Amino acid sequence: MPFFQEIKINEQTTAYFWKISEDIHWLFENVQLNEKSSSRLETMSSIEHKKGFLAVRMLLQHVDFTDFDLFYDAFGKPHLEDKRQKAKGKSLELNTQHISISHSHEFSCICISNQSIGIDLEKRKEKTLKIAPRFMDISHLENLSEADKIAKATVIWGVKESVFKLKNEKGISFPNHISESPFQLEDKKGKAQLHFNKITED
């Protein structure tokens, strides 16, 4: 079972990663799906998307939840049933009503916390750099090599996607409402602000 990594972000927040190496049939046979998820899976045309979807459910089971504990609000934001569960093999008891989900290529991840959160996985690709003017301040890419431009644009896209998932309200625009403070790739961290509906949040 290719559970890949657990990253403890703080006392209340942990991210879990799954490296997808199984075939679609193995994943399907080893997850429990509710009726809505089964119907949703059937509508997916991409095998890659199906595997990412199922790997997320494998991660839920890894931390003692199932697909039946997962639900989505009117804006499409995922939540877990409000209960206290213990992660496998861990003594820390997590209040796990908040969850964020992402999958990209051969990885899926979930982030679980007792506060609202957002997480995003992205593979570096040239396309992200080409569309960078649509979602970011391209002055933040000045004086960088082509590879570093792709890397930084990918990071900024992921940051903005995470902020959007955290707030998840209709009308939020990446270029108009989410801004990133200048940072260097080697910083390994950064700061973003959401300016929406006359409210500013860090």
Task: For each feature predicted by the language model, list its residue ranges.
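Core catalytic alpha/beta fold that binds nucleotide/phospho-ligands
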Residues: 1-202
